[in-house]
Amino acid sequence: MPNRCDFCTSSSTKDKQQWTQCDGCDRWVHDVCVSITDPVSYAKYHCPTCTKTKGPSLYKRQSKRKKIDIDYAAMHSGNVDMSLRTRHVHSSRFTDVAASAQNKEPFKRVSGTELTLDWAQSSDGLNEPVIVPKEYKDTLGMYIPEDLTVRQVAEAVGMESPVEVINVVSQNGSPGWNMGKWTEYYEDIEGRDTILNVISLEISASALGKTIVRPTLVRELDLVDRVWPTNTDAARESKPRVSLYALMSVEDSFTDFHIDFAGSSVFYHVLKGRKSFMFIRPTARNLAAYSQWCLSADQNVVFLPDVLSPDSDIYTVHLSPGDTMYIPSGWIHAVHSPQDSLVVGGNFITPLNMKTQIDIAGIEVRTKVPMKFRYPLFAGVMWYYVLQLLANPERLNTMSTKERDGLNSVAEYLSGFIKTMSPTMKDVQYRRFVANFPMEIRPFPGKTLLDYCAMLDFYPKGVQETVDIDIRKKKGESKEKHKIESQLPEEKILQGSKLESKEEVQTENF
């Protein structure tokens, strides 16, 4: 969102509610400061500076770039009716870049029979998005009702069930919606006066969700299904629910660039309509640029590919009804809906992408992603993974190289996670924190972590400090110290660990 005009002449805030972007330098200006009375009359607008170097503004001619008139003051104040009069500011730019010859889809379109667990575990398996076209959908080991409708989704979860609806222009939530109201909006094509989107309706616990079978590869890779306990009602109830979503988008919906929470992988099956994706390869340089973009005050008006280096890899994928796509861990992407669409998909953490998943969880902390948009109980999944490996150490001898390469990252992550414990945490923060620790490792989870490190023969710097950390929150009491008989051999303390400070290892923004 623009926050500065280089030509300010008025001190009145009221006069500065309308902005226009210069086509010459891309700066945003207050209309009142540059005497713009009718911004939509320009085919190409030049600010006073650009007028001197690029010539005057042009009127009533076809511009190469469609002008977008967005009331940012209304968006900022939450006035939804005023802010939803146009497309998302990046929709046209997305279409232009997607049409560029160098951004054509490079990814494989294959039969589902090729996407085996052995393939995923290989060095070149599931490193890039991969598409299974409609003609091969029966090879995925998947069942989703192909005639599913938005109304049937609503009936399955309950018409009165609340649903998170996204205001496409602002990319913020629009409160007060339930599935009944959403269904009426979606079906009333002529009556729509806004562009709204539903992308976070989790349906695995619904009657509909219980009839759906995810692709075989997803079920084989899903770490939560592998490690989360199911022996008690409480354990089953607390299991993270991210495996099945119904995504319902109207024409011209747009989701800005993002990475799925905690770097989780995605499967995505289109039932109705078409979807267009723009992917950015998750290189270290691109992830750094993405992090800076997320923190920028101008994020809403800056198209991410425009701030990447010219040689960055950007790819476009178009999906039609019946197509299925896998999105690997960490890929940055934006999504546009050229038509009304209905999609069933889901997220899954894998044991093959631990370092990437943990790195993305760290980016979420640094970019201040709200807790509601992070992977639920991510650290808890890591602990149950550790417990399973400790119970079956022989797995180290048979696991794939990809999985083994991520084990040290888990140790580093959990060492840092324990150290975020503070007796001064607010109650809600503490409850969120402690919920990640299985009962069998409380109140001193560092002992379990040390056992895991011993199994790996890998000791992150400072891991010994975790052994004495009691995660019980005690007010007005001295903390009992927990001692262990054996201490870490000094030569095992890693001096080169990247985890040098509490700030760097913090994994939850409590």
From Swiss-Prot:
Intracellular or extracellular location(s): Nucleus
Family, similarity comment: Belongs to the JHDM1 histone demethylase family.
Keyword list, A-Z: Chromatin regulator, Dioxygenase, Iron, Metal-binding, Nucleus, Oxidoreductase, Transcription, Transcription regulation, Zinc, Zinc-finger
Residue numbers binding Fe cation: H258, D260, H333
Predominant location: nucleus
Protein task: Histone demethylase that specifically demethylates 'Lys-36' of histone H3, thereby playing a central role in histone code.
Positions with biased composition (Basic and acidic residues): 477-510
EC number: 1.14.11.27
GO molecular function, one term: histone demethylase activity
Domain JmjC: 216-365
Cofactor note as given: Binds 1 Fe(2+) ion per subunit.
The protein's name: JmjC domain-containing histone demethylation protein 1
PANTHER family the UniProt entry points to: PHD/F-BOX CONTAINING PROTEIN
Domain comment, as recorded: The JmjC domain mediates the demethylation activity.
Enzyme class, UniProt record, top EC level: oxidoreductase
Cofactor: Fe(2+)
ZnF segments: PHD-type: 2-53
Region of interest (Disordered), residue spans: 475-510
Single GO BP term: regulation of transcription by RNA polymerase II
One Pfam family of this chain: JmjC
Catalytic activity from the UniProt record: N(6),N(6)-dimethyl-L-lysyl(36)-[histone H3] + 2 2-oxoglutarate + 2 O2 = L-lysyl(36)-[histone H3] + 2 formaldehyde + 2 succinate + 2 CO2
